[in-house]
Curated annotation (Swiss-Prot):
GO biological process, one term: translation
UniProt cross-references to HAMAP family, sorted A to Z: Ribosomal_uL1_B
Gene name tied to this protein: rplA
Lineage of origin: Bacteria, Bacillati, Actinomycetota, Actinomycetes, Mycobacteriales
Protein name, entry field: Large ribosomal subunit protein uL1
Function: Binds directly to 23S rRNA. The L1 stalk is quite mobile in the ribosome, and is involved in E site tRNA release.
């Protein structure tokens, strides 16, 4: 939705920019301000009090949302033999090795997450420059380089999300769809915030959660009170 459109302006008028909403209030308002006919994705943006240029202040992690994302992720798996068979059985959308790498080198990127068996990483490194900037490069820290590829596929299909701080110290992640009940959105939000807090670098000084905004992909940003770190689904 264009920020100059009549529908967007009407939605934005419902948001009090001077107010800090509870996660539950923000989830409810996000649903109300989504005017698209499609089931919009609900997203969270966080400004962190870290310096991403410092290696010891890189915030990166994964979390299994208790109520899923509302979207079935398309998963690519780099594996051969029994691991490839296990990935297929677990529901992977595409499984391969050299053939899959060549396909990606040719421009194919129709997947949302990538998993690799450890013995495939030397090969996958050939497409790191393609996958890395898109947040698709398998990494042991996010559980996407693993011998148990079947579990990794099941986790991602079940609502596991990844997040990583960008160069501007922002985090972005999905907590569900506008069709979700606001309480479920708030509980997903809480699960993600819990993990972000757990990953706070010891070298980070001052306020860690500086600014939090909830919105749908087409709606206005709704400011959330960053001091709320428990009872996320409460009024």
């Amino acid at each position: 939705m264009s920020k100059t459109s009549k529908a967007y302006r009407a939605a934005a008028a419902k948001v009090d920019r001077t107010n800090l909403y509870t996660p539950l209030q923000a989830a409810k308002l996000a649903k109300e301000t989504s005017s698209t006919k499609q089931d919009a994705t609900v997203e969270v943006a966080i400004r962190l009090g870290v310096d991403p240029r410092k290696a010891d202040q890189m915030v990166r992690g994964t979390v299994n949302l208790p109520h899923g994302t509302g979207k079935t992720a398309r998963v690519a798996v780099f594996a051969v033999g029994e691991k490839a068979d296990a990935a297929v059985a677990a529901g992977a959308d595409v499984v391969g090795s050299d053939d899959l790498i060549e396909r990606i080198q040719g421009g194919w990127l129709e997947f949302d997450a990538a998993i690799a068996a450890p013995d495939q990483m030397a090969k996958v490194g050939r497409i790191a420059r393609v996958l890395g900037p898109r947040g698709l490069m398998p990494n042991p820290k996010t559980g996407t380089v693993t011998a148990d590829v079947a579990k990794a596929v099941a986790d991602i299909k079940g609502g596991k999300i990844n997040f990583r701080v960008d160069k501007q110290a922002n985090l972005h992640f999905v907590i569900g769809k506008a069709s979700f009940d606001e309480k479920l959105l708030a509980e997903n939000y809480g699960a993600a915030i819990d993990e972000v807090l757990r990953l706070k670098p010891s070298s980070s000084k001052g306020r860690y959660l500086k600014k939090i905004t909830v919105s749908t992909t087409t709606g206005p940003g709704i400011p959330v009170d960053p001091s709320i770190t428990r009872n996320f689904a409460g009024e």
